[in-house]
């Protein structure tokens, strides 16, 4: 235990407070040092490119991870990363691509760039991930209200780096544009989409700015404001 004074960075000089506290966390009295890193699981087959945690139907946590060609679940009993990829695993991710995951009403959904369409795992009954038929491949994914929101997408053999593509209302399986509020939107003059933050509305991060996507219902579905 390190018995420093209270952290008071904005006080005058020569007070009893500490102005710099590195590698410590607050404790009942003062601060205590952070613990060293320790190994949590056995190794995957390749460098991990994403990790995600979600609770299953019983409330127990599950940990998922992905590398360049596989998706894994952490097995607590033996600390292994068990391959739960779809049959045949995945086309290798691009050099700069990573796995990004969401929890959508109990379904864990993963996006990994332009080489594989969205993957889904029912966190109560599934043993393997599976393709979401007719979904796009996407570099970015988020939950926005009752929609699965993707950005910087590829489908139909074409790549759309400045396009968002969202699912049908309250459905992760509906991706027919113009049906049940599934639709697309190009973000012009802002460069490629570099990220999406979900929530009540979409915060779309682009190379040259930020766009807000707000649900307004039919016929527009979402309104996008720069």
Indicate where each model-derived feature is located.
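N-terminal beta-propeller domains
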Residues: 1-81, 137-212
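Surface loop/turn motifs at the tips and blade-to-blade linkers of beta-strand repeat domains
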Residues: 40-45, 89-93, 130-134, 185-188, ...
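A broadly used, surface-exposed interaction patch
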Residues: 74-104
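Short coil turn/linker residues within repeat-based beta-strand modules
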Residues: 78, 123-125, 171, 217-218
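Hydrophobic or amphipathic alpha-helical targeting/insertion segments
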Residues: 98-134, 138
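Acidic/polar residues in short coil/turn loops that connect beta-strands
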Residues: 112-115, 121-125, 144, 152, ...
């Amino acid at each position: 235990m390190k018995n420093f004074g209270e952290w008071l960075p904005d006080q005058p000089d020569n007070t009893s407070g500490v102005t710099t506290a590195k590698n410590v966390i607050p404790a009942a009295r003062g601060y205590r040092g952070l613990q060293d890193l320790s190994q949590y699981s056995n190794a995957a087959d390749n460098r991990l490119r994403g990790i995600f945690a979600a609770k299953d139907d019983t409330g127990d946590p599950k940990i998922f991870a992905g590398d360049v060609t596989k998706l894994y679940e952490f097995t607590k009993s033996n600390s292994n990363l068990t391959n739960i990829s779809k049959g045949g695993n995945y086309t290798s991710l691009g050099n700069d691509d990573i796995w990004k995951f969401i929890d959508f009403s109990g379904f864990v959904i993963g996006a990994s760039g332009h080489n594989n369409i969205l993957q889904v795992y029912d966190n109560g009954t599934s043993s393997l991930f599976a393709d979401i038929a007719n979904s796009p491949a996407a570099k970015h994914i988020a939950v926005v209200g009752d929609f699965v929101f993707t950005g910087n997408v590829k489908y139909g053999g074409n790549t759309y780096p400045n396009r968002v593509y969202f699912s049908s209302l309250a459905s992760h399986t509906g991706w027919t544009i113009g049906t049940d509020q599934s639709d697309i939107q190009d973000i012009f003059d802002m460069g490629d989409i570099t990220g999406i933050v979900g929530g009540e509305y979409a915060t779309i991060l682009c190379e040259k700015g930020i766009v807000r996507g707000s649900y307004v219902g039919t016929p527009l579905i979402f309104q996008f404001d720069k």
